[in-house]
C-alpha cells in the first residue's frame, strides 16, 4: 500500500524510521521484537502460503509510556496540542481549520480558526466519517477500496507453536483471484495474548493485543482471519451494514465448538454474545462465510491437535472508505497541493504504514521549505 507511492526500497526505509522512533521513546527498547521469516515451511503446504516480511511488536504494556515520552519531546520542541477541541470543518480553499472547544464552559463561544501553509490531515479510524465528509464536499476524485472483514480467531498457543517458532506474527494467506476474494491471518498475538473489543459507529468488532509482561501470560494465540473482497459496489456501506447485522444484545458474537469467551488482561469477560451455531452468521455473510470456515477447516489439517479447541469472535473489520487520489511525490490531494492525506484518511492499514506515510510527507515538506538553507545538516537532522 505504501510502496505504490514510493517503491519497495523507500517504503521499507520509511517503516524502519517508524520503528526507530518507537524504540527512541520506548522505556525498554530492547523488548521491541521482530518476526522475520525467511522461507515458507513445508508443513503448511498446499493449504496456505506464508507472507515473508518483517513484523515488529512493541508491546501493548508500553504504549502509554511511549506516547507520554513522545508527547513530552514534541512539546519541548515547540509543538502545540489543542486538547478537548473538535475540528468541525476545514476550508481547503482558504487554508483554514475551523474548530470548537468541547469543554462545557466554552460551549456557547464562537468557533476558532487556525490558518495553515501546509496541512497534514492524519485521522485515525474515528475520523473516517469526517474525512469522507470533506471528500464529498470538495468532490475529491478517488478510487474504491476492497471490503476487509472476517473474525478474530483464538485458541491455545500450543496448537500453533510449530509455526510460531518460524514466525511469531505469522501471516497465512490464500487467494481466489477468479472470485475476487483473498484471505489472510492478521495481527497474530501470542504468549500473553488477549482479544479486545472495538466500538465503531456504535457496533462492536474485535481485535487483539499481547502483553510483554509475563505476569499476564495465558498461553493463548489470537489472530484475525480477514477476507479482502473486491467488486462490491459500496464497500464501506456494505461493511457497516454487515457489522450491524452481526450484533446481538449490544455486542458482537462468539462461537466455539467447545470453549467459552476468554477474559481481558484486566480479568473481565470479553464482551460477546455466545451462539450455539453459525447459521445466522452465514445468512448475513452469504457465500463469503464459506471462505472463513474453509480456512479454519484447513488449519485443522495443518495443525492436527487443534480440532475443536478454538473459538471465533465475530466480526473483525477494517473500514476502508474510498481512497482519495493523491500525488505520489508527497501524498497531496490532486485538487489541493498543500493538503496531504495520511493514515485512515488515505485508507492506511496499521500504525506502521500510517507513520511511514507521515514521514514521507514530512520529508517532502521540509525539503521544499528548507531547499535554500545554508545549513544542509539542518535538513538532514529534521528529516531524519
What does each model-found stretch correspond to?
Residues 1-39:
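N-terminal FAD cofactor-binding segment of flavoenzymes
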Residues 1, 29-384:
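Residues forming the flavin
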